[in-house]
Amino acid sequence: MIWIAGHLVFSRTGLVRIVGGKVDEKPWNTLFRRGASIDDMLTYPDSEEISEQWKIVSDVLMTRLNELTEDELDQPSSFNVPAGEQTVRGAVAFLHFHETYHIGQLAYLRKHFGYSQLAG
């Protein structure tokens, strides 16, 4: 579960850059990139550190999303969007889908291991 949570922070950090925001990246951020090996969990930050970075990145992202203009959303994306428009808008839409997919994985794993549900 820790890898998925770290991957979500990694992805949100990337989205902050795509929408023109700035956030200080943690040195461990690249441990959670797409295709990263999960062999050495001892190098991972603890869940509290990941959670704290999630909050920081999310605050910056929400502020920047609320500031975006239609013109900015229509600009080409610096991220190669696998499906949909190759614009900032398309990147936001794709990464929103990506995030909900992984949050669903976390919810399923929590249930499987007997933890309380994430919400509700």
Where are these regions (language model features)?
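Acidic/histidine-rich alpha-helical segments that form the ligand environment
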Residues: 37-75, 90-95
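Short, contiguous alpha-helical
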Residues: 1-37, 78-120
